[in-house]
Amino acid sequence: MPSTGTLVIIFAIVLILCIMLLFFYKTVEAGKPSVLPPPIPPPTPPPSKKKYDHNEYMEKTDLEPEVKKNHRKWANEAEHLISSSVKGLENLDEAAFLANHKGHGFRTFEHAKSLFKEFLKKY
């Protein structure tokens, strides 16, 4: 039977080998890609917007037949009125405008023109 000192030395060697094996196992596991979290996928691009088709829109609407028939003519007339309003605004007399629009909150003639142009851009 081996002495107690020999058993302690054998036990210490086995313990050291187990600890080394444990550290080796941990380092090998850390290097495996299966242990790492999965990579974040790239963001998906938003779906492309469908181009506006006016004829398709008019088919889906529940407007009266007369309105469906004449809407393009009315839209052209409205565009003409807006463009003539802009041209008229360019040729407008400043003194006459300010006299007719006293109390409407316009600071200057240029202020009124800029507000009107902003309004036309919105609508």
UniProtKB/Swiss-Prot annotation:
Chief location category: host cell
Topology class, membrane: Single-pass membrane protein
Ranges that cross the membrane: 5-25
Native organism taxonomy: Viruses, Varidnaviria, Bamfordvirae, Nucleocytoviricota, Pokkesviricetes
UniProt family annotation: Belongs to the asfivirus CP123L family.
Protein name: Uncharacterized protein CP123L
Keyword check for Acyltransferase: no
Pro residues bias spans: 35-47
Location of the region described as Disordered in the Swiss-Prot/TrEMBL record: 32-53
Domain of life: Viruses
Keywords annotated in UniProt: Host membrane, Late protein, Membrane, Transmembrane, Transmembrane helix, Virion
Subcellular location: Host membrane; Virion
GO terms for cellular component: host cell membrane; membrane; virion component
